Amino acid sequence: MTVRDGTEQRRRVVVVEDDEDIAELLTDILDAEGFAPVAVSDAAGLDRELGQRPDLIVLDLRLTRGGADKIMSSLRSRGLGDVPILLLSAASDLPDRAKELGVTSFLAKPFELEDFIVLVRRLL
C-alpha cells in the first residue's frame, strides 16, 4: 500500500456495484491507496454522482438495476465517453462484453486486490 502525505489531489473513482460487501471492500481499498472513492448501486446513483466528473468508473457488468449497457449509453450521451471504465464480472463472456461495451479495461471476478489496484493506477 502507498502512504500519501495529503498534499496532492485525490483522484475520484466511482464504483458502480450492487453487492454492498464488494462495494465496501473496493471503496475501502481505494481509500487506503489514496483515491477518493464513492460507491453507488445503480445507474440512477451514478447519474447523481456525475455532477463532479470522475477520473475513473469501476463498473459491475451484471447490475440488477440499470445495467452496464444503459450506463455506457448514458455516459456517452453526457460527453463522458473519455472517462476510463474498468468493467468487473465473473461472467464467462467478459472479454466479449467488454469489447461490445467499449470499456477501457476489464477484470474477472474473483480477483486479487493487488491486481485491482495495479490496474486502477494504470488506467489513471
Over which residues does each language-model region extend?
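Acidic, metal-coordinating helix/loop segments flanking the phosphotransfer/catalytic sites
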Residues: 39-56
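Non-catalytic signal-transmission and effector/linker regions of two-component phosphorelay proteins
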Residues: 1-14, 20, 27, 114-124
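Alpha4 helix (beta4-alpha4-beta5 surface) of REC/receiver domains from two-component response regulators
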Residues: 70, 91-107, 118
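His-Asp phosphorelay/catalytic-motif detector in bacterial-type signaling
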Residues: 53, 79-84
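Conserved phosphotransfer microenvironments
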Residues: 60-74
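Conserved acidic carboxylate
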Residues: 17, 89
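Two-component/phosphorelay signaling modules centered on CheY-like receiver
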Residues: 20-38
